Amino acid sequence: MCGIAGYSFSLESTVDRTVAARALLAGIAERGADSVGFAYRGDDSKVTVHKQRTGASEFLDRIDVPQTATQLLVHVRDHTKGHPRVRAINHPIRHGAVVGIHNGTIANDDELFAAHGIARAEPGMTVDSELIFALAERFRGRTAYALERL
């Protein structure tokens, strides 16, 4: 399975964003060796995503989060569906304007993509987690409805 962590700080917080991100990653590192990634939202509301096909220890010193970041997601992955050599499959996953991380398995994701007429965000995407974010994108503003589709 995977490891997930995150934070949400006000702009006024003096917590060092990079130190916090590295501490979170170190805390979940043993949960996934196939890939690692993080996403943060800056004060301009733009979401920046970084990910790579390595374990957390090879990535730890590369994390650099600006002090203006208010939210962060960190993910380490042991793949179950979708091989980490396809960069888009590694988390965080972006589908349209939605960025997220997930720990678990969705057995019927291919059927649900087809049933809702939703295309994968990128060629070669096969990871089941993308379905959650695709439904959230499709049914924006109707979260309960989107989750019921799962």
What do the PLM-derived regions correspond to, one by one?
Residues M1-L150:
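Conserved short alpha-helical segments that host acidic/polar catalytic motifs at enzyme active sites
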